[in-house]
UniProtKB/Swiss-Prot annotation:
Its EC number is 3.1.1.74. It is an enzyme of class 3 (hydrolase). It catalyses: cutin + H2O = cutin monomers. InterPro entries: AB_hydrolase_fold (IPR029058), Cutinase/axe (IPR000675), CUTINASE_1 (IPR043580), CUTINASE_2 (IPR043579), Cutinase_monf (IPR011150). Coiled coil: none annotated. Disulfide bonds join 36-114, 62-75, 176-183. This is Probable cutinase 1.
Length: 211
């Protein structure tokens, strides 16, 4: 399994995603450093991905939300405490507690700093496990502010029964590509695990339908 996860890092480098780097760099820390916006998007990237939003799906959803709702969206990636290391995939929760706590803290920050914002969220690969761990234990008042969550290549899909525990299924959409074995409870990485850029438009539409 370690070989399979190491293969993910190599495949990610070999399969770059075209993104606006300047826009992504600005967008990745907006909850912490910027003003409140009507919509706050919180995202956890996959293992070995750079920056706060990663490269596979986070920047795409962030930018699509901003294009659909100009001047109304703040994007926040989970980090820097969450380092998206490979080894944490082997832990019981599919990530480490530091990452889960940091993500939970960002949801709580959005709720306290911006009480009128509508929160949407997402995660890719290990980042999906981060979202499972963080959202399931949030106070109910904070959970109620989360209007929609999209998860790509969810490493906790099988273990948690295709849902985020203790969170409404109608506010969650999990994307599992055909042939992506991590969705079946393994850590075997196939090419399908890198295909989720294709789901960004649908995921964005889902989140917008909830706000």
């Amino acid at each position: 399994m370690k070989f399979a996860l190491l293969s993910l890092a190599a495949m990610a480098v070999a399969s770059p995603v075209a993104i606006d780097v300047r826009q992504t760099a600005i967008a990745g820390d907006e909850l912490r450093t910027g003003p409140c916006e009507p919509i706050t998007f919180i995202f956890a990237r996959g293992s070995t991905e750079p920056g706060l939003l990663g490269i596979t799906t986070g920047p795409g959803v962030c930018n699509a939300l901003k294009l659909s709702r100009p001047g109304q969206v703040a994007c926040q990636g989970v980090g820097p405490a969450y380092i998206a290391d490979l080894a944490s995939n082997f832990l019981p929760q599919g990530t480490n507690q530091i990452a889960i706590d940091e993500a939970a803290g960002l949801f709580k920050l959005a709720a306290s700093k911006c009480p009128n914002t509508k929160i949407v969220a997402g995660g890719y690969s290990q980042g999906a496990a981060v979202m499972h761990g963080a959202i399931r234990n949030l106070p109910s008042d904070v959970q109620n502010m989360i209007k929609g969550v999209v998860l790509f290549g969810d490493t906790r899909n099988k273990q948690d029964g295709g849902r985020i525990p203790n969170f409404p299924t109608d506010r969650t959409k999990i994307y599992c590509a055909f042939g992506d074995l991590v969705c079946d409870g393994t850590l075997i990485i196939t090419a399908a695990h890198l295909s989720y850029g294709d789901d960004v438009p649908n995921a964005t539409s889902f989140l917008l339908s909830k706000v």
